[in-house]
Swiss-Prot record:
Belongs to the azoreductase type 1 family. The keyword NAD applies. This is FMN-dependent NADH:quinone oxidoreductase. The gene is azoR. It is an enzyme of class 1 (oxidoreductase). Binds 1 FMN per subunit. Quinone reductase that provides resistance to thiol-specific stress caused by electrophilic quinones. It catalyses: 2 a quinone + NADH + H(+) = 2 a 1,4-benzosemiquinone + NAD(+); N,N-dimethyl-1,4-phenylenediamine + anthranilate + 2 NAD(+) = 2-(4-dimethylaminophenyl)diazenylbenzoate + 2 NADH + 2 H(+). Its cofactor is FMN. One of its GO terms (molecular function) is FMN binding. FMN binds at residues 17-19, 102-105. The lineage of its organism: Bacteria, Bacillati, Bacillota, Bacilli, Bacillales. Its EC number is 1.6.5.-, 1.7.1.17.
């Protein structure tokens, strides 16, 4: 069975967020088109996503030194264990759908914490004499992102770092197909905001048939 991991990184729902509204249109249509596929919604604002901190580094260090998981402190076990769970869930999925806003030219920090949890040598990539090699070569990914301005082209394009970062990470993991669906300009041209949103929703529904 095809497994889709629907990863949302927004504190608002589809009634308040452009990206979440487009994401909902996409995933609802996808479920209709692929009723036999399993879709798992991972809401990063509602799930426990540990950040790399002193407990995580300490736990990793103990494990590398030969200690067992049970020998870690309670804090270390909770954080390292959860990061392991997130990584295993990530590598078991066949498709990834990331839904984010653009905040200060990137995405919410909880998504970076999540990526840090799943970027694990030997799991999502490996080191070789020729350099790192991605291990997720049979996956595909989509990023749905709302941007108040216009960043796909023009002078502001080089300022966009959220989608570009995800693109680099997906390449690093070996994911061969990574697409972007952007909701752009609703803040720059507020009188066209609803039209922009409607057009993005229509594109999302179309894409759900081929993704």
């Amino acid at each position: 069975m095809t497994n889709v991991l629907y990863i949302t990184a927004h504190p608002h729902d589809d009634t308040q967020s452009y990206s979440m509204a487009v994401g909902k249109a996409f995933i609802d249509t996808y479920k209709q088109v692929h009723p036999d596929h399993e879709v798992i919604h991972l809401d990063l604002y509602k799930e426990y996503i540990p950040e790399i901190d002193v407990d995580v580094f300490s736990g990793w260090g103990k494990l590398r030194s030969g200690k067992s998981f049970e020998e870690l402190s309670d804090e270390e076990k909770a954080k390292v264990g959860r990061m392991n769970e997130l990584c295993e869930q990530f590598i078991s999925a066949d498709k990834y759908v990331f839904v984010t806003p653009m905040w200060n030219f990137s995405f919410p920090p909880v998504l970076k914490a999540y990526i840090d949890a799943v970027a694990v040598a030997g799991k999502t990539f490996k080191y070789t004499e020729q350099g790192p090699v991605g291990l997720l070569t049979d996956k595909k990914a989509l990023h749905i992102q709302a941007r108040g301005g216009f960043y796909s082209e023009g002078p502001a394009a080089e300022m966009e770092m959220g989608h570009r970062y995800l693109s680099v990470i997906m390449q690093f993991f070996g994911v061969p197909s990574f697409e972007g669906l952007f909701v752009e300009g609703h803040a720059a041209v507020p009188e066209k905001a609803e039209e922009i949103k409607a057009n993005a929703i229509a594109r999302a529904k179309d894409l759900a048939h081929t993704f």
